[in-house]
A protein has these predicted regions:
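Expand to "…catalyze enediolate/carbanion chemistry for C-C bond making/breaking, isomerization
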Residues: 3-253
Length: 253
């Protein structure tokens, strides 16, 4: 992930909302640049999370987690379980962002407590010096208030990425949820996130759900693109296969 950032390449991400380790293990063979296990909007619990992180170890993609909330105990758990990156939902102020980043880092830069458990398995003796400092800290901007405070949030020391969530952002502006950014305030926010990331020398990321939106985001300067939810992508692929063979789809709408 850091190598792609240094080379100014766009990194791919697949959103994991499936709690079955064997399925996630198979998806890891696709070798996306990264995978995000979703704890906010899925049925994945803590026990399952550890199994999914182990399953992702089969591939080369960086294992990441979206938190259910900005909670110190949950941040500590996902990092100790082996997450390489953490996405904090609904970051609306610089103070919230500072607290989030501090909980991801060991002293003197942060307040994370020592006890990495699985971290020692993949990082070994160098975990404290090398791996822990490379944890990706990502602030999810998904409300109008977050956009209003975007510049202060992006300036947070230690933050690696600001990530745009178009669905909830659209709702906060009074629109219906949509991965296609067509509300004027959402399209404006896309440019504002990209510009803020560039000003503060961090990465701009975005959740997309179609090749068209992904290409649009890349053209706007976004260097980290989530290409959709695993369950939805698998459903679409299986439905398309049935339609190609039998000439019709049986997918329930």
């Amino acid at each position: 992930m850091y190598k792609r950032q240094a080379e100014k390449l766009v990194a791919s991400n697949l959103w994991i909302d499936i709690g079955w380790p064997v399925t996630v293990e198979a998806l890891s063979r696709l070798n996306y640049d990264s995978y995000t296990i979703d704890l906010q909007h899925s049925l994945i619990d803590r026990g399952t999370l550890t199994s999914l992180l182990q399953a992702l170890s089969l591939g080369d993609g960086a294992p990441m987690v979206r938190l259910s909330q900005n909670d110190p105990a949950e941040i500590a758990f996902v990092l100790d379980a082996g997450a390489y990156g953490v996405i904090c939902p609904t970051v609306e102020t610089a103070a919230q962002c500072r607290d989030f980043v501090a909980n991801c880092l060991y002293p003197p830069k942060g307040i994370r407590s020592w006890g990495p458990v699985r971290g020692l398995l993949y990082g070994g003796a160098d975990y404290f010096q090398a791996y822990a400092g490379e944890i990706l800290k990502i602030a999810l901007i998904e409300t109008a208030r977050g956009v209003d405070n975007l510049d202060e949030i992006a300036a947070t020391p230690g933050l690696d990425m600001i990530y745009l969530g178009p669905n909830d952002l659209g709702i906060s502006y009074g629109a219906s949820p949509s991965y296609t950014p067509n509300h004027p305030s959402v399209t404006e926010a896309i440019d504002r996130v990209s510009e803020a990331a560039r000003r503060h020398s961090i990465v701009a990321g975005m959740h997309t759900a179609s090749p068209e939106v992904a290409r649009l985001a890349a053209e706007r300067g976004f260097a980290f693109l989530s290409l959709g939810y695993a369950a939805k992508i698998m459903l679409a692929a299986a439905g398309k296969l049935h339609e190609e063979v039998f000439g019709h789809s049986r997918t329930k709408q």
